[in-house]
Amino acid sequence: MSHSVKIYDTCIGCTQCVRACPTDVLEMIPWDGCKAKQIASAPRTEDCVGCKRCESACPTDFLSVRVYLGAETTRSMGLAY
């Protein structure tokens, strides 16, 4: 099952989400929009198992994981923005 991992603009570049992900979905990429000059990116969303460890690890509630269950209603697993 594939999950969509949404990355928005409150990332502080701490890498907590990357280290917390058990399936190596996330990685840090260069980005000038924050003090750390890097931001979390999710290039391998097909490997996401929806465990939300990245969300739990994030100190700024930056990440949102949404699970798409085929024809069923989309269920948000993310935190409010």
Swiss-Prot record:
Keywords: 4Fe-4S, Electron transport, Iron, Iron-sulfur, Membrane, Metal-binding, Oxidoreductase, Photosynthesis, Photosystem I, Plastid, Repeat, Thylakoid, Transport. SUPFAM superfamilies: 4Fe-4S ferredoxins (SSF54862). Residues 2-31, 39-68 form the 4Fe-4S ferredoxin-type domain. One of its GO terms (molecular function) is 4 iron, 4 sulfur cluster binding. It is an enzyme of class 1 (oxidoreductase). Its main location: plastid. The gene is psaC. GO terms for cellular component: chloroplast thylakoid; photosystem I; plastid thylakoid membrane. Signal peptide: none annotated. It catalyses: reduced [plastocyanin] + hnu + oxidized [2Fe-2S]-[ferredoxin] = oxidized [plastocyanin] + reduced [2Fe-2S]-[ferredoxin]. Apoprotein for the two 4Fe-4S centers FA and FB of photosystem I (PSI); essential for photochemical activity. FB is the terminal electron acceptor of PSI, donating electrons to ferredoxin. The C-terminus interacts with PsaA/B/D and helps assemble the protein into the PSI complex. Required for binding of PsaD and PsaE to PSI. PSI is a plastocyanin-ferredoxin oxidoreductase, converting photonic excitation into a charge separation, which transfers an electron from the donor P700 chlorophyll pair to the spectroscopically characterized acceptors A0, A1, FX, FA and FB in turn. The lineage of its organism: Eukaryota, Viridiplantae, Streptophyta, Embryophyta, Tracheophyta. It comes from Cuscuta gronovii (Common dodder). Its EC number is 1.97.1.12. This is Photosystem I iron-sulfur center. One of its GO terms (biological process) is photosynthetic electron transport in photosystem I. Its cofactor is [4Fe-4S] cluster. It holds the Pfam family Fer4_21. [4Fe-4S] cluster 2 binds at C21, C48, C51, C54. The eukaryotic PSI reaction center is composed of at least 11 subunits. Binds 2 [4Fe-4S] clusters. Cluster 2 is most probably the spectroscopically characterized electron acceptor FA and cluster 1 is most probably FB.
